[in-house]
Amino acid sequence: MNIIDELQWRGLINQSTDIDALREACEKPITLYCGFDPTGDSLHAGHLVPMIMLRRFQEAGHRPITLAGGATGFIGDPRDVGERSMLSQDTIEHNLESIKKQLRSFVRFDGDSPAIMVNNADWTMSMSVVDFLRDVGKNFSLNTMLDRETVKRRLETDGISYTEFSYMLLQANDFVQLNREYDCVLQIGGGDQWGNIVSGVDLNRRVSGTKTHALTVPLVTDAQGQKFGKSTGGGKLWLDPEKTSAYSWYQYFLNAGDSVVIDYLRWFTFLTQEEIAELETEVRERPHLRAAQRRLAQEMTDLVHGHDATVSVELAAQALFGRASLQDLDEATLDGALSETVIFEVPAGESPTIIDLLIGAGLVDSKGAARRTIKEGGAYVNNERIESEDWQPTDDVLLHGAWLVLRKGKKNFAGVKYSA
């Protein structure tokens, strides 16, 4: 199957230049690229679809280029509202190294069709202002640039600086440089990048007469229509496990709504059309089993954190709800699992009772409620039922010397952390 046909059944083509011409070009191996600016020290879930697209093309025999925006990161792609904060060179360089490591886990840099990683600072920083205006700027109409949606929105509100206004020219020049050096003929990106990407197609045509192509992926939203990738805490869902634990990552996809889970399986996984059709039947006929969500969570955690992490977080989920041993969890997995809960911190030297712990962790609101919970058999510490109101933990009960998992009933739990 031609890669373009594959992308079409998956619903992964939002906009493109001449699709028939692109399909014909992809009958033979091509070189394509996607750029990532180092505006943070980690990529996030919003970057996933284009990153996975690079792998899809590579597995179909095409050569991907990952472009790290060492130059464009200093400028910042215009947002709908407000100027971006300028980043220092040290910050840019730190972010670049972090992002490069993450990109290397998505595409192969050896074997067949090995990927290439480039930094647009290599050609942008050495270009003089005169050369840039003469060789790039002269090929752009101000009317066309002003017609870009993001630019129009900014001009209608708080305006836009010349710096950010020029961003599309820098990105267009990237495409020209990659076409010259690597015969790169396709740029892919998110739906909000369409204007910048077609600027590169136009610039290639004007400076060398070369026919190149553009393709953007759909905007991904959750079941509530909110921008994809927001964690339950309201922040971004990061690829860096230090920022978003593997457990939180898994839980995000496990909680995907029925209305979006099949799209997510098409967009984010490498499952076949037949496998996804079977899961679609499960959603329609047995939604309460959440088979599609579980498979999605497994596939996405495998992809970003590795299979061992998937096994660990599934064990953690079982352990938190009393279906497996908490003692089998390593400290990082336990910490990640409890990061989604209330953490009650116990100062060094204090020895609270089970009643104090239940109240402190917010599982009950009074001593009377705590006593009733204990009497009714609903108080658990590390999945062991507590039957005495006077119970206090001893050192041998603490997980990794510092933690307790406190549970009320079947589903309400919290973490207790003892200070050293």
From Swiss-Prot:
Catalytic activity: tRNA(Tyr) + L-tyrosine + ATP = L-tyrosyl-tRNA(Tyr) + AMP + diphosphate + H(+)
Residues noted as binding L-tyrosine in the record, renumbered to the chain: Y33, Y167, Q171
Single GO MF annotation: ATP binding
EC number(s) from the headed UniProt entry: 6.1.1.1
Cellular component GO terms held in the UniProt record: cytosol
Domain of life: Bacteria
Pfam families xrefs: SYY_C-terminal (PF22421), tRNA-synt_1b (PF00579)
Family matches, as SUPFAM superfamilies: Alpha-L RNA-binding motif, Nucleotidylyl transferase
Binding of ATP, residues: K230
Residues in S4 RNA-binding domain copies: 352-418
A biological process term (GO) from this entry: tyrosyl-tRNA aminoacylation
Localization per Swiss-Prot or TrEMBL: Cytoplasm
Subunit structure: Homodimer.
Family recorded in the similarity comment: Belongs to the class-I aminoacyl-tRNA synthetase family. TyrS type 1 subfamily.
Protein name: Tyrosine--tRNA ligase
Taxonomic placement: Bacteria, Bacillati, Actinomycetota, Actinomycetes, Mycobacteriales
